């Protein structure tokens, strides 16, 4: 294990306030430092153009910072989490906003729970789009339907951003699976959020 006295500091990005408090107290009690919290007032360098900047989730800001520093701008970030978020960043490091859609797990769970004769299936890339049985048909609808959602939102965001070359990066646990079925994503970066946390930590630690 690691020596608890060996940590110089830490940073927390959380969209669950009760958990944020628990993590903050844990760091102070067991690790000996007060963590930096990603939220209003944090130095990130990004200019947030949302109607109410406080509404932007900490994870979206962290991803935006990492994507801009790693890939430049303009850039679109697609994060496959509990919800799937789409975020638009300009060449001048402005956070324009984005879109929030139900995550693929939430969508599939709704299908299982609302349709009495349907059952849970593995979320996987089907061999074909035309299913030959109920399980195959559900896998096809879930997988290819979700790819359609992603591609359409990315295309429309690019249009609103003025077109041209706009890099698109995806992150989140299901990014490799979903992005294997589309050419609209330029890179899958599973370290994006952690890289963003490090960048923001370095900017605020002093």
Regions found by a protein language model. Give the residues of each.
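Short, surface-exposed recognition loops or helix-turn segments adjacent to catalytic cores
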Residues: 80-83, 126
